[in-house]
Amino acid sequence: MIAITGATGQLGHYVIESLMKTVPASQIVAIVRNPAKAQALAAQGITVRQADYGDEAALTSALQGVEKLLLISSSEVGQRAPQHRNVINAAKAAGVKFIAYTSLLHADTSPLGLADEHIETEKMLADSGIVYTLLRNGWYSENYLASAPAALEHGVFIGAAGDGKIASATRADYAAAAARVISEAGHEGKVYELAGDSAWTLTQLAAELTKQSGKQVTYQNLSEADFAAALKSVGLPDGLADMLADSDVGASKGGLFDDSKTLSKLIGHPTTTLAESVSHLFNVNN
């Protein structure tokens, strides 16, 4: 049995979609916080079990009979370390033999503040005695494209990444890699630095938005403090705004760049380009 935490989340549902191509539904366990959101998974024959990252006992119960676990990092930045400890402890108690974990690109040397909890989780895995693999994911293209509608409306894309190169890929690309690692043999003990095949700057993103929309969009680089303040002014929670601003500054220092093409090698095809992602965005919104 293969289990996925956060199975109905933004990455998790793509992982299950990819897994279903090669693994029978009867061998997949979706661990979810809210089973009501997993009715479609249950209808496909997938086992749905309820457990919250904060409830070690429920996680231990949910992991009974599971051999392999994909630990998708919690969405609660600042609470990730204790929550991941719960999952790892539960996996150990339930007899899970292998864990794949979605970490952060070059976590051990990353300038991003986000790296701290990932490094802590990686150490927990090393100390757990369970065989594991690290999926050090780079940035999701969707992270930046979420700001595209506002940029098109105002003609300005704001950020604090300077000329930093961002080797992003889509969630579906990263999910395909996770599905392969969790379902195939031979990946145990590996550390995969995963990122898109081609890197781009926010100036290039603005140019691509201009090209495909016909509306002029320029990139305006802000200081970390000013970018965080701008995000808060449109309603983002303080913690999220500060994290995004810190990540942009990290990108300016090379924190979101990698040119190894490990991701495309792992999934067997090129990663989704920026132009393709922008095109998809417009098709969905139209």
Swiss-Prot record:
Cystines in this chain: none
Keyword flag Oxidoreductase: yes
Catalytic reaction equation(s): a quinone + NADH + H(+) = a quinol + NAD(+); a quinone + NADPH + H(+) = a quinol + NADP(+)
InterPro entries per record: NAD(P)-bd_dom_sf, NmrA-like, NmrA-type_oxidoreductase
One Pfam family here: NmrA
Keywords: NADP, Oxidoreductase
GO cellular component, one term: cytosol
MF annotations from Gene Ontology: NADH:ubiquinone reductase (non-electrogenic) activity; NADPH dehydrogenase (quinone) activity; oxidoreductase activity, acting on NAD(P)H, quinone or similar compound as acceptor
UniProt-annotated binding residues for NADP(+): 6-11, 33, 73-75, 138-143, 171
Enzyme Commission no: 1.6.5.2
Annotated SUPFAM superfamilies: NAD(P)-binding Rossmann-fold domains
Function noted in UniProt: Quinone oxidoreductase that may play some additional role beyond quinone reduction. Potential redox sensor protein. Overexpression induces retardation of growth.
Oligomeric and partner information: Monomer.
Family from the record: Belongs to the NmrA-type oxidoreductase family.
PANTHER family for the chain: NMRA-LIKE DOMAIN-CONTAINING PROTEIN, QUINONE OXIDOREDUCTASE 2
Protein's name in the database: Quinone oxidoreductase 2
Species this chain originates from: Escherichia coli (strain K12)
